[in-house]
């Protein structure tokens, strides 16, 4: 295949450049000032666009996506949302999960995403995990992963609460990439963390835990996980998502925990959209923000990513599948700089997913996002929908806008 030349794009901090990408290797081959690279049969004019690393979505729930109206959900806190989802999930089919997840992935792709880590529930009926096929959501997403190969990388984490060991083994044998857990919903959080690490180690897969999804400063999932990882010497990759309670403890305690997390090599995913929506409903005065201690984690050297979490389901009726919205919220609610916030949904997200660096730099993976803007602050502030998305150097999505004034 012929290489693709992207002409006249603006790179953050570097000015206007021409970027040559190899569609064979999927890497950026050359970056040069305008006019220095020879013309070829495949060129795109990106004048007026800012060229960025393509975002990755480190935390999605594609099996739940687009069910807010279907489930008849009402606003409420986390446990209210869990109850609403379980009631709906008891009758959901594999085909329905597949179709909704496909629509959600199309939204993510159009917004710039080229890699997604999605959690998928082991589906229960009212009697627990024994009725129907608890793996039907996983089967739907495995089919979707096969269908999307070459356009988007899909990692699947099996999410459970006190599910039988044999069901977890079966899910991983089917092809799930990681093992998830919600220890704060378990009858025995410490035992749940230990079991998750044990089974993941047996299958040589990573883990991604929903940790401390509460404003209770006494919650301790993250510390439990860090200490268990250090004691076990777990090496397959560990992620802790949410970690909300870390944001409401005293700064010295947050710093101590962050150091333990860094020592254990755990990546943390903050999820501002859903946590701002679900958390703090019982505190009508001086309501906490429901975010983890992002600055303390960064200062300790922890890899921090940011995700969108829910896409219009019982856990958040307004999720837009747009990492640039997530980054914008990190500036507003997390007090990160625009550059830090953008990194959380690009480089930080890819690092948590275990993917190599991407972006408009020689030798990097040619997963790229071109946005009609001039600066990073404009990208996050205006959230312009005019975007071109490249996966492995290949154009996979283009959104154009017609705006008329009368």
State the predicted function of each range:
Residues 68-119, 125, 131-147, 169:
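Alpha-helical scaffold segments that flank or form the walls of functional sites
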């Amino acid at each position: 295949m012929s290489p693709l030349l992207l002409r006249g794009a603006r790179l953050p901090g570097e000015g206007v450049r021409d970027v040559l990408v190899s569609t064979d290797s999927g890497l950026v081959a050359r970056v040069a000032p305008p006019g220095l690279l020879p013309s070829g049969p495949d060129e795109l004019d990106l004048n007026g666009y800012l060229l960025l690393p393509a975002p990755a979505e480190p935390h999605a729930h594609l099996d739940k996506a687009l069910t807010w109206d279907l489930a008849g959900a009402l606003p409420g806190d986390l446990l209210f949302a869990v109850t609403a989802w379980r009631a709906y999930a008891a009758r959901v089919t594999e085909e329905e999960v597949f179709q909704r997840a496909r629509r959600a992935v199309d939204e993510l792709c159009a917004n710039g995403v080229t890699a997604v880590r999605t959690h998928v529930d082991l589906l229960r009926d009212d009697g627990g995990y024994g009725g129907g096929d608890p793996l039907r959501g996983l089967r739907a997403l495995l089919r979707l992963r096969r269908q999307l190969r070459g356009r988007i990388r899909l990692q699947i984490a099996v999410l459970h609460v006190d599910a039988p060991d044999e069901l977890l083994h079966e899910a991983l044998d089917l092809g799930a990439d990681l093992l998830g857990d919600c220890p704060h919903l378990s009858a025995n959080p410490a035992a749940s963390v230990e079991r998750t690490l044990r089974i993941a180690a047996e299958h040589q897969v990573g883990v991604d835990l929903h940790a401390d999804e509460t404003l209770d400063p006494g919650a301790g999932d993250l510390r439990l996980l860090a200490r268990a990882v250090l004691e076990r010497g777990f090496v397959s990759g560990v992620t802790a998502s949410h970690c909300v309670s870390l944001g409401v403890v005293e700064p010295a305690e947050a710093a101590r925990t962050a150091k333990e997390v860094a020592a254990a090599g755990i990546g943390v995913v903050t999820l501002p959209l859903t946590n701002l929506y679900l958390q703090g409903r019982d505190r009508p005065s001086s309501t906490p923000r429901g975010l983890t201690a992002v600055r303390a984690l960064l200062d300790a050297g922890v890899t921090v990513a940011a995700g969108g979490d829910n896409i219009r389901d019982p856990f958040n009726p307004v999720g837009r599948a747009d990492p640039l919205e997530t980054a914008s919220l990190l500036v507003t609610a997390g007090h990160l700089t625009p550059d830090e916030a953008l990194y959380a949904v690009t480089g930080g997200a890819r690092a948590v997913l275990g993917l190599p660096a991407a972006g408009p730099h020689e030798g990097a993976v040619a997963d790229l996002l071109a946005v009609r803007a001039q600066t990073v602050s404009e990208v996050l502030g205006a959230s312009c929908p005019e975007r071109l998305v490249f996966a492995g150097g290949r154009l996979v999505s283009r959104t154009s806008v017609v705006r008329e004034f009368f």
